[in-house]
């Protein structure tokens, strides 16, 4: 952070549905380029390791394990990168499947944040496969690392104490009471929202207005 500013970037890589290896390679290429440009926070889309439109393939252990293998590979490849990266993947925890954001930096998993609000209308049917996240924090083992799991996690940077990161996923922001509201009340100064929202008439403008309004009310980036 310089003069109160943090260089952040949002990415939308070209993905292949259910091809976790390819998707991880695309993410790494963009992440390495971002790190070279001084980006300290890199946000990738919801389900970027698998693609959003996997449907009932999300329930297959092959895809779930493929996403974990891709995440483990990314961790190994980013050990020297001084950039916090957020990537989306499905994660099975105690027999329940969650839509998650993994927070990683320098080869370490800093935490896993599950999605709170699952859309189940129109073209969305996430409740068919996934379980809503809880504010209760628990410890899980992911890619051989003990990591905290829960919707209420905040991440404070030791080198930049004023950088406190809160995380939510897509529909969370569209809800009546977004998790980001509670993150800001708890001290978050930056909110990252991993999204895989589709495009319909007027939606892009509405989404920008939604983000701008929430950022203004919460006094955070």
Language-model segment annotations:
Residues 1-221:
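Enzyme catalytic cores with a strong preference for nitrogen-chemistry domains
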